[in-house]
C-alpha cells in the first residue's frame, strides 16, 4: 500500500486499525520545501516506546534522518479549540499529546521543531524551517505561544 501524495510505502502495525488523514496544506507546503532542498524525510515517524491512550503510536509529521530532526506542523487546532476538529476534551487531549512528544524528544536529546500555522507565510526555504524559535526547549513549548 502507498501514500496518495508522496508514494511512500505505508507500514501497517498490528495494533493500529486506521490510517492518518491526508496532509494538511501546511504539511504539504513543508514537503515541497524539503523536496526543493533535496532533503530526505520520513512522514509519520513513530517510535515503539512513544504512544498515547489505548497504546496508539504517536506520530511526528516529519523526520529528517540525515539531520536527526523531527518537524511538527501545528495547525490552529493546536492552539485553540476548533469545533470542526474536536470538542474541548479532544482539544485538551491533543495538547497533552503535543507535550508528550516534546518530553520524549527532550529526554532523548532529539531535536524537534514545531512550526506554528501563523508562521507558515514567513517560511520560504528549508533553512527557514529551522529557526531557533521553533526548536522545542520545554515540554510546554506551545503553551506560551499565542496566535496573532
Segments (PLM) and residue ranges:
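Nucleic-acid endo/exonuclease domains
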Residues: 1-148
Amino acid at each position: 500500500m502507498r501514500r496518495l501524495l508522496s508514494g511512500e510505502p505505508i507500514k501497517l502495525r498490528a495494533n493500529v486499525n486506521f490510517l492518518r488523514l491526508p496532509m494538511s496544506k501546511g504539511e504539504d507546503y513543508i514537503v515541497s520545501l524539503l523536496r526543493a532542498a533535496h532533503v530526505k524525510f520520513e512522514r509519520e515517524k513513530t517510535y515503539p516506546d512513544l504512544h498515547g491512550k489505548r497504546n496508539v503510536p504517536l506520530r511526528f509529521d516529519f523526520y529528517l534522518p540525515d539531520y536527526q530532526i523531527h518537524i511538527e506542523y501545528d495547525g490552529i487546532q493546536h492552539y485553540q479549540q476548533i469545533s470542526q476538529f474536536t470538542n474541548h476534551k479532544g482539544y485538551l487531549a491533543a495538547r497533552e499529546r503535543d507535550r508528550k512528544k516534546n518530553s520524549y524528544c527532550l529526554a532523548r536529546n532529539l531535536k524537534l521543531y514545531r512550526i506554528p500555522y501563523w508562521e507558515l507565510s514567513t517560511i520560504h526555504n528549508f533553512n527557514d524551517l529551522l529557526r531557533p524559535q521553533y526548536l522545542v526547549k520545554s515540554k510546554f513549548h506551545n503553551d506560551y505561544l499565542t496566535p496573532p
